Every structure is written in C-alpha cells, then in structure tokens.
C-alpha cells in the first residue's frame, strides 16, 4: 500500500514555512491524540501518520531528501522518520498541554534549566482604612508572616559543609519520561519530587526545607482616591523561592470602613442633612461637613421639600491617578417637630386654619385627584 504525501497529511503546501507546518501539526496532533480518542484505532493510526510526516518535514535535510526522492529516500533501511528522541522535545510540549504538567512558573528543571527552581507562593494581606485615609492617601506599615530563604544553608536545604547530590533517578532534571505504547509521557520525578537533587544531610535550621518562617515589616503607599476592594500588588514581596527560584508577590486588598456621614459612589460623596420645618419653609443657611475636615455653607431656598439635593462641586473624592475630583451631594430631609408645648400646638393649629391650597400645592393636587377618583369629598 502506497504512503500518502507528507504535505497532504499535514494539510500544507510544499512551500510552507517551518512555522506554518508547526501550527498545522499542533492542531492535528491535538485533534487525533489517543487520549482524546480512547479506543479509536483510526485516530491512533492517523496520529502516528501525522507524527511521521512532521518529523520528516521539520528536519531540513530530511525534507530536502523527501522533496527530491519522495518516500524512496527513506526506503532500503534508510531509517525513515519514526518517533525518535529528536522529536521528543516538541512532543513534550504537547503532552504538557494534555496532562497539565507544564513547566511555567518554576517547579522541576526544564531542558537546560536549573534543578528544582521553584517560585515562592503569592501572599494576601487585608488592609482596612478610613474614608478620610482614602481621600488623602497614606503610608502604612504592615507586618506579614512569611517564609524567607534560610540564611544558614543559603536555601539549599543542605547542612553547611555538605551539598545536595544529583538525583540518580532523573539525572538532575527533576522529571522522568516513561514510555506508554508508541509515545512517551514526562512526569515529575518520584524520587526527588522535582528538585533534581537529593539532600542526604539536611540543614538543622530549616530541616532541609531551604526556607524558614519569619515576620516581615513592609511599608505600603496607599494612593489618594483608592476605592473599596482595590488590590495593590507588591512584586517580589511574597514568599521566597526555593533553590534560587524567584519570590512570589504580595497582594494587599483594601477595604474602606463605613463612614458616619458620607456614602460614596465612585468619586462622588453623598450626605443626608436634617433641616427644620421653619428653614424649609422660610429659607436659611445650613453648615455641612466636608471630607477634608472643613465645613461649608449651603443656602436653602424657601419651600424646600424633603429629598431635595444640592450639589457642591469639587468637594468629593479625588480620582485615582488623576487630577479630577468628584462632587459632594447634600440631600436634605425636613424634620417634623416633636415634644411640642401647648403654645406651639396652638400656633401650628392657627397656621393650619389660615393655610390655603397655595401653601400645600402637592397635597392639594394629590387630594383633588383622589376626590375625582372616588367621586366624593375627601378631606386632606
């Protein structure tokens, strides 16, 4: 049975670049991989065929020979493009995608890397501040429990005067490759657990861990205008890495205490202020607080009703990393008098008897509509 053309198998032209062939191969390999098609013999055959085609065409010399002589270039014991070690590096990337055992961010040594380099863990710190502190910004000193590199063994985990030996199982790579059928799977070394080294005489200060627990003091700059839930990242301030690996990051999550007077919406502030019935009816001025600690005057016009809102421009919160500032909104509510004296009651009753619909336009309009609805007299 004649073999199919390698270019046809990969779905590329004879002028395809190495990058185009690699993209085509990766797509086909993931489609027909046996793990995605368990028990499918056709997919298994197709997968082998794709591997064979790519190994030939990804090699410059083999591709030149194939372009000139076709499949005959590898016949007569020519050692055709099977599934050899020269193909293993690329397939290892494919297997990482399938089995989730990738090398990103540390762990075991990759090809040509450093044995056992492991990135330190990220840390989280919750910081609560006041609204005033969010307005001005602040420098905060915090203490965090964390792991740092052991100073006695310098992070090696070995007792001073000794040093780790190369793991004989993985030859220092931290990973071992096992054959399963016609392909290989790369796993973390079970002997050294990915370190690539064996510590025979552990450091007594860190018990061979390479790190010790300590409390660290850090200074954090909280900028003006921060909002509730904001996250501040401090690169490299997390746990120390292992065996020369990079440190993790520290994430500071901000929460803002509820304020006694102000509610916040973005850069704007809102404040509810009580006013007397007389001020609402006759007009007047009220003094209201501002977030910067000062006070300002607000003119209340005659006839002001509850829920009337007044805007004070530029008295809100600063916008983070900007020169813009929000506004302050004052919402008034008319306070009903309580604990009245006899004389006060008489005065209010006299006012009520002398009042006309023009004094209460909303009430008059409402009860007029109710009267029309029910078709009868309705007394306010």
Swiss-Prot record:
Q: Per the record, GO CC terms?
A: cytoplasm
Checking SUPFAM superfamilies in the record gives:
Chaperone J-domain, DnaJ/Hsp40 cysteine-rich domain, HSP40/DnaJ peptide-binding domain
Q: Identify the residues that bind Zn(2+) 1.
A: 150, 153, 203, 206
Per UniProt, the CR-type Zn-finger stretches lie at 137-215
Keyword annotations for this protein, in alphabetical order, are:
Chaperone, Cytoplasm, DNA replication, Metal-binding, Repeat, Stress response, Zinc, Zinc-finger
Protein residues bound to Zn(2+) 2: 167, 170, 189, 192
What SMART domains would the database entry show? DnaJ
**Chain's role:** Participates actively in the response to hyperosmotic and heat shock by preventing the aggregation of stress-denatured proteins and by disaggregating proteins, also in an autonomous, DnaK-independent fashion. Unfolded proteins bind initially to DnaJ; upon interaction with the DnaJ-bound protein, DnaK hydrolyzes its bound ATP, resulting in the formation of a stable complex. GrpE releases ADP from DnaK; ATP binding to DnaK triggers the release of the substrate protein, thus completing the reaction cycle.
- Which protein is depicted? Chaperone protein DnaJ
What is the organism of origin for this protein?
Methylobacterium radiotolerans (strain ATCC 27329 / DSM 1819 / JCM 2831 / NBRC 15690 / NCIMB 10815 / 0-1)
- What's the source species' lineage? Bacteria, Pseudomonadati, Pseudomonadota, Alphaproteobacteria, Hyphomicrobiales
Gene expressing this chain: dnaJ
